[in-house]
Each structure stands twice: as structure tokens, then as C-alpha cells.
Amino acid sequence: MLSKSCRAISQRSFSQSSLVFANYGKPQNPPIDTEIKLKIQPIVRTGETIEVKRARLLYQSRKRGILESDLLLSRFADKYLKTMTMEELDEYDKLLDEADWDIYYWATKNYKITPLPDKWKDSKILKEIQKIANNEEKVIMRMPELNLEPESNTK
């Protein structure tokens, strides 16, 4: 007959090896969400004149980093930025604070990939960008010239 200490050792070894065997091949750490979600707060600009704001928004519309967004936003800026009110410029500025791919999917109405937030559902600016994305005129899109000067009729 086995002594008490020998039985305790064999039970401990058996129960420990059972746990190791039961977990064999399973991941030992919980799964890690590999997508990092980081929202950088936009810079609060105070005392910016309307001309400076238009120039900054024109640059930010064109230099996004994603060609598709650059094309849509720079064409929008070229067409509308010169005549927008300060309130419209503020709304457009807030739209440009969103992620590039989100803006692109909203502009192309691809809401399955990136759902449209409630705050942009009634946006006239986004609707105009969506019209540009539809390209109803069937023109070949290219980057417009960087120019904030009004077009002159004198030649």
C-alpha cells in the first residue's frame, strides 16, 4: 500500500498534467484586438481670418495622403471654398477632422464599410461631395490648381 505522502504526490502530478493536457494546443493568452483606435483631437484655432481659413482648408483638402480623398475633396474645395460662409467653412473643417477612409466611404455612399454617423446625415457639404463622387458629368478627374483667387473675366 502507498503511503499518504506518495498518494498526495501522485494525485498532484496527475491533476496538474491533466490541466496541461486539456489546454494543449489552445492559445494561452486571450486574443488581442490588433486594430488600434486612436482619435487625435483637432487643433483648436482661434482668431483665424476667413482668408487664412480658406487657404488652410484648401491645403488640407488636397494633401490628405489618400489619392481618392485628395481628388474628391480638392475638387469640392476648388468649386465651393471661395463662396462658403464662415459657418460652412467651420462645418467643412470638422468634416476634414474625420479619418480619410471614412470621408471617402461616406462620399461614395459605401455605408457597409463605414456607417455614416448621425452628425453628417443632414450635411449639405457632404451631399455636395457625394455629387462630385458620382461624377454625373463623366469627366476625368484630376487635381485642380491650387488657387484661391477668384477667376477674372479679363484676358
Curated annotation (Swiss-Prot):
Asked if the record carries the keyword Mitochondrion, the reply is yes
One GO CC term, this protein = mitochondrial matrix
In its UniProt entry, what is this protein called? Succinate dehydrogenase assembly factor 2, mitochondrial
Q: Which residues form the signal peptide?
A: none
Described function: Plays an essential role in the assembly of succinate dehydrogenase (SDH), an enzyme complex (also referred to as respiratory complex II) that is a component of both the tricarboxylic acid (TCA) cycle and the mitochondrial electron transport chain, and which couples the oxidation of succinate to fumarate with the reduction of ubiquinone (coenzyme Q) to ubiquinol. Required for flavinylation (covalent attachment of FAD) of the flavoprotein subunit of the SDH catalytic dimer.
Q: Which UniProt keywords apply?
A: Chaperone, Mitochondrion
Q: Which SUPFAM superfamilies match?
A: YgfY-like
Q: Does the keyword DNA repair apply?
A: no
Q: TM spans, by residue?
A: none
Q: Which organism is it from?
A: Candida dubliniensis (strain CD36 / ATCC MYA-646 / CBS 7987 / NCPF 3949 / NRRL Y-17841) (Yeast)
Q: Subcellular localization, per the record?
A: Mitochondrion matrix
What InterPro entries does the entry give? SDH, SDH_sf, SDHAF2
Its family remark reads: Belongs to the SDHAF2 family.
Subunit structure as annotated in this protein's UniProt entry? Interacts with the flavoprotein subunit within the SDH catalytic dimer.
Q: For this chain's UniProt record, which GO biological process terms are given?
A: mitochondrial electron transport, succinate to ubiquinone; mitochondrial respiratory chain complex II assembly; protein-FAD linkage; tricarboxylic acid cycle
* Extra remark beyond the main annotation: This protein may be expected to contain an N-terminal transit peptide but none has been predicted.
Instruction: Return the Pfam families for the record.
Output: Sdh5
